[in-house]
Regions:
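Positively charged, small/polar-rich N-terminal and surface patches that mediate targeting and assembly
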Residues: 83, 200-202
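Short, well-ordered beta-strand elements within core beta-sheets of diverse protein domains
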Residues: 112-121, 168-177, 229-233
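Hydrophobic side chains in well-ordered alpha-helices
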Residues: 92, 182-186, 240-244
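PLP-dependent enzyme catalytic core of the Aspartate aminotransferase-like
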Residues: 7, 122, 177, 204-260
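Conserved PLP-enzyme active-site core in the AAT-like
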Residues: 1-140, 147
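Conserved small-domain helix->loop->beta segment predominantly found in fold-type I
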Residues: 131-191, 197-200, 214-219, 259-260
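A common structural junction motif
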Residues: 100, 189-198, 247-257
């Protein structure tokens, strides 16, 4: 980001962790750089939620959340949140909000209040289950790599522990698959995970990047066809692990037939 600085730069927008491969930014370092150059900083904090990361305490100016994710928590509301100093928020309200006129309905506001009441316990549950899923994937012979901030083999594990109190339910991994057909076999054998690209609700989801393979959007990503993102919901860990095990075993059987 330092090399991207230009004479007319006014804002640094970052996401940490990001929502596919979960690389982190050093928030204190970014904030220090921005203040040195009189730049405003805004971070997308949906991955960690307010429970697991508070970027303002590291010097970031403003925080935005997709409240449709963890804050709502039930996949039934579309909303966003912006947090910052009262003076800044007041200026946004007076100069931007009143111009754009965007506002959530009373019912959506009530749904967010409902979600906030259970947010801490949901995040705790999601993270505990996710840690068990990561541990299972780490020992499976068909798993090539794992992306998760609190995975101890992660190159940024130390930074994650410094900035975050937890890592939530999003992770990704790559499968030792030799073809799209093998990835299709993996997807077709998932019975518990729903194939969907959103996250933050109560149900567990799988998003294999090969779903985009025939679309124009695939050309915009450098992710390999054997890449899968998982969102771990509020279910018990055992059926989720069993589901992944069955799907991976189906791939192994297909690979074995190919070798014969």
């Amino acid at each position: 980001y330092k090399n991207a600085l230009q004479s007319n730069t006014k804002l640094v927008f970052l996401e940490s962790p990001n929502s596919m491969t979960f690389e982190l930014q050093d928030l204190s370092e970014v904030a220090s750089f921005a203040k040195k150059h009189q730049l405003t900083t805004i971070i997308g904090n949906s991955y960690a939620s307010p429970i697991f990361q508070n970027p303002i305490s590291f010097g970031i100016d403003m925080v935005v959340h997709s409240a449709s994710k963890y804050i709502g928590g039930h996949s039934d509301v579309v909303a966003g949140v912006i947090c910052g100093k009262a003076q800044t928020i007041r200026k946004i309200f007076e100069n931007e909000f009143m111009t754009l006129g965007s506002i959530i309905s009373p019912n959506d506001a009530w749904l967010l209040l409902r979600g906030l009441r259970t947010l801490p316990i949901r995040m705790e549950r999601v993270e505990n289950t996710t840690q068990q899923v990561v541990a299972f994937l780490a020992q499976h012979p068909l798993v090539e790599s794992i992306n998760y901030p609190f995975y101890q083999q992660s190159a940024q594990y130390k930074l994650a522990k410094q900035q975050m109190r937890g890592a939530g339910g999003l992770l990704s991994f790559t499968i030792k698959a030799d073809s799209l057909a093998q990835m299709e076999t993996f997807c077709n054998n998932l019975q518990y995970f729903l194939l969907a690209c959103s996250w933050g609700g109560y149900e567990s989801l799988a998003f294999p990047i090969c779903c985009l393979y025939e679309s124009e959007n695939y050309g915009r990503t450098n992710l390999p066809y054997n890449f899968v993102r998982l969102y771990i919901g509020l279910e018990d860990p055992e059926p989720l692990i069993e589901d992944l095990s069955n799907a991976l075993n189906a791939v192994e059987k297909m690979k074995s037939k190919t070798r014969i």
